[in-house]
Amino acid sequence: MPRFGMVIDTRKCVGCMDCVVACQTENDVPHGYCRDWITTEVRGAFPDLTLEIRSERCNHCDNPPCVTCCPTGASHVEDFGKVVQVTANKCIGCKACISACPYGARYVHPDGYVDKCTFCTHRVRQGLDPACVSVCPTHCMTFGDLDDPKSAVNALLRSRTSHTLLPEAGTRPRVFYLT
């Protein structure tokens, strides 16, 4: 079984938000909500400052606190790709997973269940990339199997310095940012 992950090249991301709109459209995300978003962060120390623009989403962690705290099992790790998912009809809307997620990657859908990025597994099962990856005009996002040493994501991780968000949280995120 694959273990999906994503690599985002922060040198290429221009913050255009095509990924956000594609996700909202593909996944019928209600107006005013999003499963992914654009963040800007100033990195470094003056006078050597850089602006990092990055697309963020659920990190589909290897050690997801949102799964272990869920009282109903609605938050779970799917066998296919080891992707963190939410089963809407099992979710009671208690928000424990929202509190547990250090990345702010979840929200309560207007229908009362928690929603988040799914890595578009409905598309991936058909051999397609997630919607965000497929529309990116700068090709800054790469999706693939982290357990396949020959995958494009692994080639990128070997070729450049990368970081994850909040490594100190111990979640072992699977979204990597090339710097």
Sequence positions of predicted segments:
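Non-ligating segments of multi-cofactor redox enzymes
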Residues: 1-179
